[in-house]
Each structure stands twice: as structure tokens, then as C-alpha cells.
Amino acid sequence: MKKIVLAYSGGLDTSYCLKKFSEDQYEVHAITIDTGGFSDIEKSNIKKRALLIGAKKYKSIKSKKTYYEKIIRYLIYGNVLRNNNYPLSVSAERIIQAIEIIKYAKENNIKLVAHGSTGAGNDQVRFDMIFQILAPEIKIVTPIRDGNISRKNEIKYLEKKGVKIKWSKAKYSINKGLWGTTIGGDETLTSNKALPEKAFAKVSQTNDCKKITLTFYKGEVFKLNGKKMSPVKIIEKLSSLCSQFGIGRDTHVGDTIIGIKGRVGFEAGGPLVIIKSHHLLEKHTLTKWQQYQKEQLSS
């Protein structure tokens, strides 16, 4: 029986891949790379779902701290917003996820890896590129891209195979991480429609005002309201607070690596507040030429 490592998020796309591989007699190692965004309950449910659908082995790899140390803090240093709008919420974490997937495959001498990306966006390129650079000898399998499978047909297939899971938000492709959440759906395939409230992970709950204070040291946030804590914890707390107000929701339009326009909704209140605060602080402390050089480097 062939073994395959699947980058598994617990969502519809990767659940389809898992069931398809299982039905095709693969020994599936479903691996979740925890770059933040999931509660303990959600992580437990992802594991249960993977084993229920047919994974031979399941593992969740903690990479939240690595994600911050290797990537996020540099995005803060550079006040990085793609098209002055999008904080690279999910795109940035794909590198860490791909590296960990290949690392697991090599450690277990598995010659096949898979991801659930479609053929429309940048994620497919990010995964493929990292996989090919780090392990050109390992074959990449992409069922959804290769078969051009729609989400509607994925649900039909899973139901046909007896997977009785209620995909409450299957209409939307949702990717959650420490640096924000992206949401794709029918609305984002247009140029003028906005995502409805129900598409977001949390419904905004208040219209009240709340004052917060962030403290930075050498470009890194290390205090929230005067209380010292890790940058990761601050991002999590700030994101949770912002979601109550609906702060950080927007739609990004960009040019994909494959040459077409792409549109995606996102919610990244914590990241946006941190970046805007850091940028404002720099306006007060850096000279105009320091700011100019820094902007060139971050671009």
C-alpha cells in the first residue's frame, strides 16, 4: 500500500482529498500544521474528522511560534500590506506549512505528498515550489486541481461515501491562521459583491468604543495595555478583541502568480492594528530618509 502525506486542515477540500486517497487504497498520513487560528476544541475535532474519514495516521504539528519568528515579525518590521490593504494573512503561512509537511515526509520515508489547493490561486504555487525545492524526489499529488473538482461535487462525493458531516460553511473556503483569516466564495468571484456577515468566523457583537495601548521594542510588540506578554499572545488577544467590533474586514484584489486577477475576503483585525500602530510610531521617530529606505526594503 502506497503512503501519502496530506496537508490537512479539516476543511471540505482536504477532507475530500483524504477520502479520495483512502478509497484509492493509500495509507494516508493527515498532517495539520498549527500556525494558529484554531481553538483546542477545533483542533480536537479536526483530529476526529481525519480519523473518521480514513486517515491511517494523524498528527498536529505546532508551528505558531516558528511562524511568528520566521515570518510574521518581519512583516511587522516592514509594515507589509499587499496593495496597501492585505497583510498576507494566509499566504505567508503556507511556507511554514509546506516546510513541515516535507520534513514529516522525509522523516517517515514517504515519497508522495498532497495538498488541497485548486488551480486558481497562489497557494498551489507556494506549496509546489517549496515541495520541489526541498524534496524534488517526492511526487506531488493534487486531486482537486487535477480534476477541477467543485465544492458542490466534493460534498456529493463525501455524502455518497457515507461521510455524514454538516459542512455548515461549505459555501465558503475559509483559511484561519495567527495572522488572520481569508474567506473565498461566490461573492469573491465577482468584482462588486461583498461577503455577508455569516461568512465570517465571528459575528461583530458591539458598537462601543474601547481604548488599547500597544508597546513596541525594536519593531516587535511586547505589551498590550501595559501588560507584558509574548507577541503571539498579543496578536491572539488583539484579533479576538477586534473581531467583536468587525475591525479588520476587507476584500483584497491582487494579481496571482499564474497571471490572473484574484479577489479574496479577509479578517485580520489584530495584524492591521499592529501594523498601523507600528507605522504611526515610525512616522514620529524615523527621519524621512529612514522611512524612505525602509519602505523600499519592505516592498
What are these regions (language model features)?
Residues 1-299:
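Nucleotide-activated chemistry modules centered on ATP-dependent adenylation/adenylyltransferase
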